[in-house]
């Protein structure tokens, strides 16, 4: 298990290259959910998601000049941006159906993209082959100490921000793909509030962490269905991340694509924020699982905002509760 002190060391390394993203609240969303919610708006981070934190921490400690990473899009942008900040080179293995906004983002940071078929090929195997053949450093999306500690810096910021407003959460809702963000976040938050309930939120049919927590072992998703939450389509939890998460997390929650789209609409309507589907699942859980949030102080992590315009406009057509 890693410590808050290691996360503090990571923060010292990366803080000059990241945004300290704001915390926000909405009386209207509190009314809808009958709870008291604080939002961490990590969609306002550089590259549009939390992923740059881990990438900066990893690359900042490596002596290599070249890096390769498998990614659905946000990790790719984080790695490309971090490599550029350190004047290094990046190659990203991305699905051919990745959102255009994420592809354009990677290219804007100078990343070299290699596309693969999400449903037929293994991006990790492709990236590791490149690493072996060319001597590039392989940067995993979540299952590595430096990635976890880098993502944990988000939790370190939250500790500081909530202290300033005297807010003590009862419950935390955070997206979960491979588990890198929520494991680092949990280490940070549990250093202050050991009895905190932290729930991973995943897309329906891709709830491998939810099932793994129930079964007390890593579950593998075999029936791969499509989902609009492209950033969270992990078929099994990371080995390292799950060792942490099975000790620190409460039960998992899954949300539908429709609920994620409605949450994007709610975020735009009441927070004036733009979220991507995977970045909105924690809000979707708050809106749809009253038994988890009602009459509680809740921290909701809004993890990313890299959404294609067409999907965003479609989200605004969904029906949401108006006040």
What are these regions (language model features)?
Residues 1-323:
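PLP-dependent amino-acid enzyme catalytic core
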């Amino acid at each position: 298990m890693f410590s808050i002190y290691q996360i503090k060391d990571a923060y010292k390394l990366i803080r000059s290259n990241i945004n300290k993203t704001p915390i926000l609240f909405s009386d209207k969303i509190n009314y809808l959910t009958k709870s008291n919610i604080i939002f961490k708006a990590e969609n306002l981070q550089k590259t549009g998601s939390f992923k740059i934190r881990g990438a900066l921490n990893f690359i900042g400690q490596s002596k290599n000049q070249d890096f390769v990473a498998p990614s659905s899009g946000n990790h790719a942008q984080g790695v490309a941006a971090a490599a550029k900040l350190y004047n290094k080179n990046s190659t990203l293995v991305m699905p051919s159906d990745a959102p255009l906004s994420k592809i354009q983002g990677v290219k804007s940071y100078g990343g070299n993209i290699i596309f693969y078929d999400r449903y037929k090929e293994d991006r990790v195997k492709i990236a590791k082959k490149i690493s072996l053949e060319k001597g590039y450093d392989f940067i995993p999306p979540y299952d590595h100490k430096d990635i976890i500690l880098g993502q944990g810096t988000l939790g370190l910021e939250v500790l500081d921000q909530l202290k300033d407003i005297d807010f003590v959460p009862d419950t935390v809702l955070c997206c979960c793909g491979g588990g890198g963000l929520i494991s680092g976040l949990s280490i940070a938050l549990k250093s202050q509030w050991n009895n905190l309930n932290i729930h991973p939120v995943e897309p329906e049919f891709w709830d491998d962490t939810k099932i793994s927590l129930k079964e007390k072992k890593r579950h593998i998703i075999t029936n791969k269905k499509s989902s609009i939450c492209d950033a969270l389509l992990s078929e099994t939890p990371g080995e390292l991340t799950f060792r942490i998460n099975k000790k620190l997390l409460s039960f998992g929650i899954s949300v539908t694509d429709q609920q994620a789209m409605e949450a994007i609409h709610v975020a735009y309507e009441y927070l004036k924020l733009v979220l991507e589907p995977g970045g909105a699942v924690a809000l979707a859980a708050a809106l749809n699982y009253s038994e988890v949030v009602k009459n509680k102080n809740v921290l909701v992590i809004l993890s990313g905002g890299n959404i294609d315009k067409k999907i965003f406009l479609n989200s605004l057509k969904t029906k949401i509760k108006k006040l």
